[in-house]
Structure formats: structure tokens, C-alpha cells
Amino acid sequence: MAKESYKRDKPHVNIGTIGHVDHGKTTLTAAITSVLAKQGLAAARDFGSIDKAPEERERGITISTAHVEYQTKKRHYAHIDCPGHADYIKNMITGAAQMDGAILVVAGTDGPMPQTREHILLARQVNVPSLVVFLNKVDIADPELIELVELELRELLTQYNFPGDDIPIVKGSALKALEGDPEGEKAIMELMDAVDSFIPDPVRDIDKPFLMPVEDVFSISGRGTVGTGRIERGRIKINEEVEIVGLRPTRKSVVTGIEMFQKLLDEGQAGDNAGLLLRGVDKTELERGMVIAKPGTIKPHTKFKAEVYILKKEEGGRHTPFFNGYRPQFYFRTTDVTGSVTLPEGVEMVMPGDNLGVEVELLAPIAMDEGLRFAIREGGRTVGAGSVTTIIE
């Protein structure tokens, strides 16, 4: 496909395939591109090119992820597929590929398997808003078994607080579709219709309440203090009131100037690297790790539950397990804060390569919402990653 064909005339949605190993996630990804390519909506990608996913680094963690793009009549999609189970876990916990929705692939021959459960749980924990199911390999599965698998899946989804009764379950064969079989292709189109209609349009970053993490602080003599950073979400205009949140008691200020690349602007928006001039704020009162946000939209917290992934030794992580009371640094947005880890009941220690839910208490409060990602570090070296699942205080 020609480079210039990407137009913003359709809503953009990030999705991914999740599910148990060998249930057909990558084959399905290839089948979607091949079926849509026939309608001029995608560039066909074969199994091999998706399976040999390039390695990327996100928060100091190496993850293999394949990125595929395609369109339907209604939307533009960026689709991720991971070769290995560990890559999925790392991807979902680090938010390397933030998914607006996912296609859960389940083989009709097997039904739900351990990784099926784990991926559904992770999707719930890291706030993947919506799932659609593709029941694969139905051409070689026993029809009676397929009915049972569907019932079992709906129960499993409900158990993890997804709307199990309403989620579309599309039955088909990704391999048949890839081979050009008309019935197989029809199932893929049915799946894409389900994804189009059931997975909601995401709220764009620019439409969310304003937030900018402070990266650097300096003072302009006679004018005041400037906080610089990349605007994470929303937009800000001159003379708007903001709150400065995190590390110290929350305080209010007014933005009296917005600067970008040495030019003065009327407004800054999500994605911009900007400097905000703040009225009545001393240089000593603003520091890296705080956030500047729309008043009342974010609060500072010290105690939370999180889903974490701990790096293996081969990934540059710890060589030894850690125990209850472990005290690393937690890197949120732009700064490290020391915190202590409480392990769940019955868990004695955590080995490199494990993923689990823990409770964390920070020494200083950080502006956070559920879903915020962080890195776990020891003296600047990343040893893990996590996602805030529940705020306690």
C-alpha cells in the first residue's frame, strides 16, 4: 500500500489477538489481512511475516510484537499479535500496545485453556474495555463440542466481569479463510462486523481532561516558574486554572503562558512538548515527577494494588527471587519513588519471570488513576513492570 493512503477520515482503533498458544491467533491475523486485501482495505500479510515479530523495548523491557494495519468500511485498525505467551503478558502489563479492544481466539477443538483464562484475567486487570470471540478450527471440531465450548466461554467471560451473555462469538476457520475458502472468508467478514459494532470507539487523548507530567523546571526572571513536559492528554489554554499534584500537598495555579519551541502559543494539546508558565509558583515548589492537571481530575496516592511482571535474568532482570517487604523504586511517568511490596497470602517469594498481583505502598504520593503503568527499578536498572489495578489510599 502506498504511504500516503493513511487518512484520518475514519475512527482509529487499536486491537489485538489474544488467547492460548496454537489456537490460531497469528493465522487469524493473516486471514483478516488477506480477506480485507481482496476489498482493497489492507495489504495482505502472510503467517511468516507476522510470526517473525520484531523486538521492541518498552519501559526497559524487550517485547516481540507484530504490528499489522487494515481498514473496514467503518474504521481504521492497528492490530497487534505476539508470538509468545510471555510477550502477551509483558505487552499487556507494560501497555506497550494499549488495546481499545481485543479478539479472543479459542480453538473449538480444545475449548478454553489455561492461557485463555490468563489472557481474559489480564485484559480485565489492565482495562481492555471490550472483547469479541473468534471460535477457530470449527471445520475440524465436533459440532456438539462447539456448543459446549461456547457455553463454557460465556461463563468464563462473565466470571471475569465481561458481559458474557452479550459478547459476540463468531465461529469459523482462520486457515480455511487464508486458503480462500468462501465459507471461511464469510466468517472473517462476520468477525470484522462484530468488531466494528461491539468494540466502542475509544475516547481520544485530546478529549480527556488536561494532564502534563513535569520533566523539568526553570525560572524566568520577572515572569515566574516554567514546568516543561509532554502533554499526556487534553488541552490547555492561557489563563486556565490548573492543579499541581504529587510528591507534596496539591496546590492550584494559573497558566499565564504556553511555550513550544521558543514560540508563545494560545493553547497546547496532547502530544505537544510544552513549557507552562505558572502564576505564583516558586521554582522550589515544582519538581520533576509532579503533574500539572485540570483541577479535580487526578489525586495523589501512596497505596495501590498492581499486576506486575518481573524480568527474567536473561532479560536483564534480577538473578534472585525477592520476598515480602521488597523495596525497589517505582518509576511513574517521569520519576522514581521508593515503595515496599506486600505479596499475596500464601506467596512466599517471587521468581524472575513471574507475573502476579501485589500491593505497593510508596514513600511519597504520586498522581495516579487505575490503569497507570510503571516500571520497577533497582538503582536505575529496570527489573519489572506493572499496571495499577486498584487504588487503596
UniProtKB/Swiss-Prot annotation:
MF-aspect GO terms: GTP binding; GTPase activity; translation elongation factor activity
The GO cellular component terms are: cytosol
Q: Which reaction does it catalyse?
A: GTP + H2O = GDP + phosphate + H(+)
Enzyme Commission code(s) on record: 3.6.5.3
Chain positions covered by the region annotation G2: 60-64
Q: Which NCBIfam families match?
A: EF-Tu (TIGR00485), PRK00049.1 (NF000766), PRK12735.1 (NF009372), PRK12736.1 (NF009373), small_GTP (TIGR00231)
What is the protein's given name?
A: Elongation factor Tu
Native species of this protein?
Pelodictyon phaeoclathratiforme (strain DSM 5477 / BU-1)
Tell me the lineage of the source organism: Bacteria, Pseudomonadati, Chlorobiota, Chlorobiia, Chlorobiales
Gene name, per UniProt, is tuf
